[in-house]
């Protein structure tokens, strides 16, 4: 069994766990990082008799180039940033795609693998790969049974941590009620945006930023993490949502 590690999350966890213990030395932080990584591998072996992990880390995301407000409100920790750069220097087996966040890369890899475990504290990732495990050593592998419904709910609600507004005054419970009325599908999500009088540009922005690159929402999708394939999929992602949103708003 393959484990896809959201290594951005692992780096954060190791950094803050070390700081909480009064340790600010990068080498000590790396020891924590290695312990967390080993724990993930051990869980795979304990549950599936064999296992391997792939450490995925974010590159510079195209989303910030298109929408500068994306994650603008997040506070930057310069020490954490320096530790992240240190990790990139000493780990030779990191999977980095220059224009994609780890979310996009993990989602694409998970679809290609078909059966894998995503290790992350980011709840969004388990909406797109339901077999998941949080990062802490004592966490167990779980399954998000309603992951497809959670995808649609999030498209309406947005993601405040990433500065994605969603529909004003629509929380998870309201989103569920609206989807019960309209139908549990992407077309209904866009119809709800339209009927709530959210502008077409804002609707498109929200859906583009929330939804990761995946087969279902990329025109002419091709699996691959090289530069040309990545660009193809980014453009296909934009075309898919632009055509779908425009069609429904113009009805």
What do these predicted ranges mean?
Residues 1, 250-251:
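Short intrinsically disordered terminal tails
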Residues 1-86:
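Domain-level signal for Mg2+-assisted phosphodiester chemistry and nucleotide/NA-binding surfaces
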Residues 47-48, 71-249:
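Extended two-metal-dependent nuclease catalytic cores across DNA- and RNA-processing enzymes
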């Amino acid at each position: 069994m393959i484990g896809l590690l959201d290594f951005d999350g692992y780096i954060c966890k190791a950094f803050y766990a070390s700081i909480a213990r009064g340790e600010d030395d990068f080498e000590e932080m790396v020891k924590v990082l290695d312990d967390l990584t080993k724990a993930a591998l051990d869980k795979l072996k304990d549950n599936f008799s064999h296992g391997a992990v792939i450490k995925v880390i974010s590159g510079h995301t195209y989303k910030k180039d298109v929408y500068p407000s994306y994650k603008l409100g997040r506070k930057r920790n310069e020490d954490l940033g320096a530790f992240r750069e240190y990790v990139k220097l000493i780990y030779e087996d990191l999977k980095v795609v220059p224009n994609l966040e780890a979310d996009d890369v993990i989602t694409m890899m998970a679809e290609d693998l078909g059966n894998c475990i995503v290790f992350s504290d980011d709840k969004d990732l388990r909406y797109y790969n339901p077999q998941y495990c949080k990062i802490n050593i004592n966490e167990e592998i779980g399954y998000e049974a309603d992951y497809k419904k959670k995808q649609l709910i999030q498209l309406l609600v947005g993601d405040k941590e990433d500065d994605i507004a969603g529909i004003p005054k629509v929380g998870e419970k309201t989103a569920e009620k609206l989807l019960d009325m309209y139908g549990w599908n992407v077309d209904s999500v866009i119809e709800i945006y339209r009927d709530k009088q959210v502008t077409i540009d804002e609707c498109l922005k929200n859906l583009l930023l929330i939804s990761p690159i995946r087969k279902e929402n990329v025109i002419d999708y091709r699996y691959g993490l090289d530069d040309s394939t990545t660009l193809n999929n980014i453009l296909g992602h934009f075309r898919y949502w632009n055509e779908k949103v425009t069609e429904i708003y113009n009805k």
